[in-house]
């Protein structure tokens, strides 16, 4: 899958969750011309890279692009702690990723989720997520 620069403005807020989906997809997903992600609520490209790295996802990145090598069998064997950098879309995306793993995935700084999805935790729990807040 290739997401090109001309599509980025239309789907800028979906890039974090698309990156998660790409992590479990077969083959490579290329997202190019996405430099404006570095200037959203957080540096979203950096936050995506850091989170994917902690989950063991293979990827290559540059200043304005990321290529994610999907792995349908991706799993983690130990607890992982991911920083959302106060970005609600990063937090929701990596919480959703956590549903796919046998081990615990912890997200720091999730209080901003209410910004875009006030009932996220209720909805997420109804899908089987075991959520603990501190």
Where on the chain are the PLM-derived regions?
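Short, structured segments at the rim of ligand-binding sites
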Residues: 1-134
């Amino acid at each position: 899958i290739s997401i090109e620069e001309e599509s980025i403005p239309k789907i800028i807020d979906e890039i974090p969750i698309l990156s998660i989906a790409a992590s479990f997809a077969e083959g490579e997903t290329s997202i190019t011309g996405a430099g404006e992600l570095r200037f959203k609520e957080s540096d979203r490209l950096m936050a995506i890279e850091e989170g994917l790295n902690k989950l063991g996802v293979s990827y290559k990145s540059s200043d304005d692009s990321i290529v994610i090598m999907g792995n349908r069998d991706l799993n983690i064997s130990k607890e992982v702690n991911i920083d959302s950098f106060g970005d609600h879309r990063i937090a929701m995306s990596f919480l959703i990723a956590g549903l796919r793993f046998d081990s615990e995935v912890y997200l720091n700084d999730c209080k901003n989720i209410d910004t875009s999805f006030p009932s996220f935790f209720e909805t997420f729990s109804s899908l089987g997520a075991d959520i603990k807040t501190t």
